[in-house]
Amino acid sequence: MSSLSQQLKSINEKTASVALDRKSRSKIHSKSLIFDPKIASTQDYDYLYQIGLEGLEDLIEIDSRFSKFKQTLFSETTINLDRNVQTQDTLDQLNKNVEVFLSLVSPYYLLTPSTKAVEWLIRRFYINIHNGEMLLLTSLPFYNSPVFVKILNVIPKNQFPKIFEWVVGYKDLLKSPTSSSILKSFHNDAKFFELYSKYLMDQLNNHAVFKEQLVFYLANTVQLVASFTHNLGQFGETYLPVILEVVGKLLLAGSKFSSTLRNDIMLTAYSIISVLSSLVPLSADLVKSFTESILQDPTACDSNTRKQTVIVLGQLWNFYNEDNFEVDCFKNLPASKLVQDDLLKNLIEEGYKINKLLVVYFASNLPQIDAFKIFDFINVDKSETFFKIVTSKLLYYAYNNQDEAIRAKLIEAFESLLRTNKELFVKVLQNYKDGLDISQLEMQLMTTLGDSNIENIHDADIELEDEEEEEEEDQAVLDVDFSDVCNSLENYKTSTTSFLNKSSDEEFTKLFQAFAEKSRSFNIKSQKLILAKFSKAIFVSPEASISFMLRVSFTPSVPLSIRLLVLRFIKLRLKELSLSEDKIDTYLLAPILLLGLYDTNKSVRAGFAELLRVVKDTTSKFHGNKKKVKTSLFMEDQIYGNTEPSKRAIVPPQDGLEMLNVLIEDSKSILDDTVIDKSRLNYVLFQVLFKSQKSGQKKFGQLLLKTFILNQWTLPFWPIVFKYKVWNIISIENNSNGGNDDRFFFIDTDLTDYFSNRDDLIEQAKASKIDFENDVEKAIVGLVGGTSSNDKNVNKEADWLLKALEAPNKLQVAAGKRLSSVFTSFTSIDMRAKLVNKLIELLINDGDDSDNLVVDPVEVLQLLDMDHETIISVLRNVQIVSQIPEQGIVKRRRRSSNSTKQAMARDDISSIAATHLKKLTIVLDLLEFNLRKKTSDIAKPDLLQNLFRILTDLDYLGNDGNLPILYAQETLASCMLLSIVQMKDNSKSNSFKFDSNVVRADLIVNSIRLSQSPQVQNRLLLVIAELAALAPEIILHSVMPIFTFMGAHTVRQDDEFSSSALQQTIAKVIPALAANGSSSLSYEIEFLLTSFVAAFQHIPRHRRVKLFTSLTKTLSYKHSLHIILFLMGQQYSNNITRNKAHESISILEFTSAFLKNFSAQEQLEGVEKFYQLWNQIPNAQLEPNSDEFNALSSRSIFGVSILSLSKSGLLTFKSQLLNFIDKVLDSDTQNDFSNLPSLKLKIALILLDPKKPAEDKSDLLNYFRKVTSFILSSLDTFTNVSRNDVLLDNLYALLGNFLDLLPLNYFIDSIIDSLDCDQISNTLEIKIAKNFAILASRKIENELNANNIDDVIEESILQKLLPVLNKGIKKNLDIELQQAYLNAFSSIVNKFGGSTHLLVTQGNTEALINSLNIITSNSGLLSEQPEIVISSINAITSIVNVLGVKAIGLFPKIVPPSLNIWKTTTASEDESSKLLQASIILLLACLIKKIPVFMTTSLDSIFITILTSDSVDNTVRSSVLQLIVEHMELSQVLKSLCNIWNNKKFYQNDNAGNLGLYLNVLQSTIERMDKKSASSQSTLFMKWLIQAFEFRHYAFDENNKFDNNTIHRLESSFHSCGASYVMKLNDKSFRPLFANLVRWAVSGEGSNATGNTELSRLLAFFKFFSKLQDKLKSIITSYFSYLIDPVSSILNRFANGDIVDINLRRILLNSLTSSFKYDQDDYWSQQSRFDSICSPLLNQLSNIEPNIGKYLVKCVSSFISNVSSEEYNEKLVHGLIEFISNENESTTSNTKIWTIRTLKTIFQKMGEQWLSYLPTLIPYIAELLEDDDEEVELEVRNGLVRVIENVLGEPLDRYLD
């Protein structure tokens, strides 16, 4: 930019708010965030300052930092400060203050105070002009809020910041920008993104950032990064540095923010980093830098942010692709934080990818001990790379770290890697440095890698070498220098004589570590020599040395190579002993060596087998012959320790040799099996060795050898490396046989001392790498329990298990599992109960000491195989009340409530009761579980009796002790229920007897009533139900209380369980009562149903139908369905009486849905029995104590409440019952949401199905006969005996609805006799017949259709019903009956005629003609009763509709009488007249459709009839009139329409609506007519048109009969009709007619009106002519020849004032304008026509009315435009000058003004064509400019002159001058 442009821009910015005029100042001042511009422009600064200050004060309350602006931007001195006159320094400071304020206020833009404060800055300092960019930056996060739109609005468009130009479009639209537009601007303009990013960093520096701003930046940055995924090069160059700078700033934001905002800032940075790392490849340095920055924040590892920190680090490092996994950026991330609160575990479970992060972290933090906390969470299984990295790092520190704690962690890690992938682990070892194998690693770590869960990890078993090999190897190592090793061994010399004692643990560990340390650096071959030297140098004797070596070989933690080396060493030493002169026997080692055969490693087992062979060889050498040799026993003291000699079960040498011979044969040793499979050792010992025999000693193996071996194995001081193998061997044997007495060898030693030694054993196991839980504790527990006859020892075992269950450790779990497996082996019931009670006590104490309880007692209890006796014993132990100390002697079994409450008031007793309640709950849970398993025969009467006692006790505790017994009650009820069900199932094989004093139904009923829990109540009801089936005699005496409770409570519950319990109870109690032969069964059922129905409103709505349906089916519909209907009817009656409409509807809906669940026969039988009950209700009040009264009052369904009603009350009640059942039957067929078929459909399916048995149909019809007979007899009673009209109406309705259920043919057959007039003899029969006829009509209407009309239906209706109806119509017995017959007749004919062609057959046609004769006689159409006439017309209509032209013979009997009848209705407005008119019109419509040709003669009368039937709706009449147009000859229709208007004076009708209908049908007729017909009737139509045009005058003469609006509407219709007709004519036919019309308009020729009608004629004509002009346009222009002279004359008369009619003048001018406009043939340019119209037209200017002057201007300008020529223009100019010249004295100001406006319009239209006449007009224009009338002057100056100047292109002043 040039320096000049820079200077100009600077000047422009400084002066942008400078305004030089008032308008500009007002515009600048009107920019406001709060006020409308008009209001804002008038406000002063004092007022604005007060608003701004008020806002600032409110902001100060929110943030005190705003207070500093009180002295600057909001100082009172700023009211008079004008920034446009300030120095540059002042402006710089002002801008700085504004920017700081805007930055600070930006979070509060949505608050009113901030708007007020910013309003002051905008209005006073014009920050919208000078600080617009900052204003937009601070408000941009609120882009979608109204305040941002306001800010856009106040920034002037010409001052809009260039970088924000993208938002100008939204400013113009006053709309918020979209999020996509903002993203687009960031994407397209890197400078804009950089600007906002720097602004955000400034906000962070100023501690003014806020949540919305962070969200805004994050959302856009994330989308921005995503948008550049295909153009990362550009992104990396332009945007990435900016984003990285912002992220760095966010991560180092500092701690001055609130904790919430600090978290928001941190999460914003994390989110951006996450997106960047996933979409943009980040360098390793950047990843490390991000990590350091993230962890540099001290809050990054806080509890509320730690998770997010690890997630983002995980995602960041997941894309790290460098080989170097050792980094130093995690120093601020301690491992303890990562594992705290299971963070890593939860993240891994949630699927977050953090594995690579953990690998890098672990590799970077080794060998720190904390790093191993992370190792367990690293998954190396799926990544070979990770596996190699981790393994290599661990190997490095295994060889380069001496810390013992690190070594232990390394061992755990290596074992984990081995479990994960053994093959890969071995491969990594082989590739590490010079190559390693697992044995070398074990030597380095001095431990065995792996456990029992890992298969043999060595590539091949290491076999013991022979002596020859040893000699070669010894020779090979002679050159190795062992001097240093030998010298150092002297320091470890020990005096310990035996290492087979656990007291030597410490010494053993110390010596082995010394050996391991010394031999670690040597190879295996060298280690052999070192071991020999070690043995000689350290131990005091060979025995001590061998004991040490044996222990080493048994210790799993010792590397395998060392163990094998030691076994080889032992083998050599034992061989040396065999060659010794001291004759030493080594067979005492056999039991120990046998244990070696149970090792997990095959090579070790093979080593021990070799040792046994050596021992066998030695023993055989000394004792192989029969000669006795005296020998010493090797290692006796080391093996037996301090054990008394008498307790050492040592076998003689010969027996020892025999034992070894059994184990090791010459050819094949059975020990070979154990070498292959260690589990074979049990077989070798217990099936071979211990069962071996020796001559003379049958129990040699069973007694002697077993005692010898087990005596050693039970030695308590042996180290765990020996004992755990012993325990496992004996445990397996004990469990495999269901119990073995060999286990008792250990009961007084190992088992008894186990609890005290357990902690030491754990430490020993850990040191030796023995799995304590599986290999020690499981084996120990396995020694306990099993079948045995030794009750003393069994009791000891039970006590041991009890003690184990109390142990505060995992021993509980093992003991619990063991107890569940050996529980049945305890034969003592008391012992079983003791064990169960112990588990219960543990469960009770769980809450008090839950930390020490590891086992789940509930699980153990459920695993126990309980029997009946044990359950009874446990139950007796928890009878609660018997445990409560009584204060006094109880004399009754049932304790008084008062005494119990007193006892329970004591705290100690209450505590005891609560504890025992817990016990009871557990026992009941246990009992329920076992009952549900059905694994044993637990359920017996004594169990039930105990449960009943507990039920009573619970009632006491719940009601008197206020203890929470609900759960216990519910469980108890379940137990009782299950036990009864099981006893019932077993009742076929067992007969049960119950103690009636204990097992009592009243106890259950009492508990039900006392309980507040619906669940308990329901379960106890089920108990009653099942008990009723098992022992009905128990519940017989408690039936009524049970039913009462169910009706009052259970039915109200809204759950499936309650519903099920209710149904099951009834289903089993009622049959039990019936089976018991109860005579009162029906009364009990009535009582039950009464209870249930009484609670109907409280039963959940959606359960009612299912409940009562189930109830009915359970009780049998024969016993219950009618009772439910009767009781529901009572409920309905009560609700109707109390005006409870909603409840009444609810009852009807329920009953209808309820009945649908039963078959047709069941429903009908229920209805019949309902009527029987209804009939039992007396018609009058009964005498109290009478037999009938007593009989009814004893029944719950009647009761005193009904019998106490008065006579009227009883009759009302009976009436309402009838109304109820009637509505139920009526609603049966209505649509509902049920999928079940209605009763009507069910009946039809039976009666109409030919496959149904005849018996079923007969039974069904029999029900109809019974009910019908009953209703008819009731009708007779309430008609002749005790008349009651309400009851009669209900009975009639009921009879109709009931019979309506029958299929149509059955229905007709059932009513045909009642309709026969020959059998009607009294009023009752007439009424019945009438109701049947109405019902028949309705049924035929609803049910008859083309699909269901068959021969049966046809015969029933046409052959049976129709003749009966004809006979009844002809006889005319009663008006209502006659009407019903006629209506039924109409329905039949309409249905059959519309659905089939059966009625047009010859026979049926004759029958209909005969019927028509009857109906048109005095019995029908000619009757004096309007009702009968209406019905007759309907019947005639139906017949005509069917027969059509075949009915023409009776035309004279139909149409003329009908029209005559219509005439009688015109003078009356009653309802019958309306109905008559409507029916007659419908009859005419039918005739017009069916026989239109024959209706032509009566067309005038038909039109008059239809058009003047005011009582009939217009839409009906309009549709009938449309039928006439559609079906009749249109020329006749038009002729008739014109005739009734012209000749019959229809226009005189007083109803404008009728005239409208007339014109509508005329319009339709014209539109449908063809041109030929229209031309033929044109003369007649023109006569009509002329007469129609005179309608206005007629209305005026009739004292303004219609208002102007009505007349205008009618005239508009006249014109539409006329115009439409003209469009049907050609020019030849229309011209003469038009000429006639003109003559009528001008001279009145052919007018029928009287008086002076000239103006009305002209007005009507020109309105019509204008409409024609709009339609025909130029076609009709030439027709003006007929009008030129009349128009000129009329115009002159207007100019002279002879005629004054504004409307006519306007229409005339518009007509001329249209003619000029549509003139395409220079019609008006013809000289004579121009001369004829020019002057008259211009003369209108002389006196034109102001309100129509514009029409004249338009007319004149159109005329001039049309006739434009020099000759005509000259004449027109001078003609116009005449009306503006002052020389014409008659010219008025009004004339001048309209002439000036005319000239202005002419110049606008003609343009330069009229400039040539300007010199002529200039003098007159100048004259007008000086006119005395100011209005004239202004019109010229502002109108004409400006137009001329626009055309001229220069000012007119010089011409005027």
UniProtKB/Swiss-Prot annotation:
Keyword Magnesium attributed: no
Cellular localisation: Nucleus, Nucleolus; Membrane
Pfam families recorded: BP28CT (PF08146), HEAT_HEATR1 (PF23243), U3snoRNP10 (PF12397)
Listed GO CC annotations: 90S preribosome; membrane; preribosome, small subunit precursor; rDNA heterochromatin; small-subunit processome; t-UTP complex
GO molecular function: U3 snoRNA binding
Signal peptide stretch: none
Topological type in the membrane: Single-pass membrane protein
GO BP terms, alphabetized: endonucleolytic cleavage in 5'-ETS of tricistronic rRNA transcript (SSU-rRNA, 5.8S rRNA, LSU-rRNA); endonucleolytic cleavage in ITS1 to separate SSU-rRNA from 5.8S rRNA and LSU-rRNA from tricistronic rRNA transcript (SSU-rRNA, 5.8S rRNA, LSU-rRNA); endonucleolytic cleavage to generate mature 5'-end of SSU-rRNA from (SSU-rRNA, 5.8S rRNA, LSU-rRNA); positive regulation of transcription by RNA polymerase I
Transmembrane segments: 267-287
Keyword check for Transmembrane: yes
HEAT repeats: 1817-1855
The entry's keywords: Membrane, Nucleus, Repeat, Ribonucleoprotein, Ribosome biogenesis, rRNA processing, Transmembrane, Transmembrane helix
Annotated SMART domains: BP28CT
Family recorded in the similarity comment: Belongs to the HEATR1/UTP10 family.
Function: Involved in nucleolar processing of pre-18S ribosomal RNA. Involved in ribosome biosynthesis.
PANTHER family on file: BAP28 (PTHR13457), HEAT REPEAT-CONTAINING PROTEIN 1 (PTHR13457:SF1)
Complexes and interactors: Component of the ribosomal small subunit (SSU) processome.
The name this protein goes by in its record: U3 small nucleolar RNA-associated protein 10
Organismal lineage: Eukaryota, Fungi, Dikarya, Ascomycota, Saccharomycotina
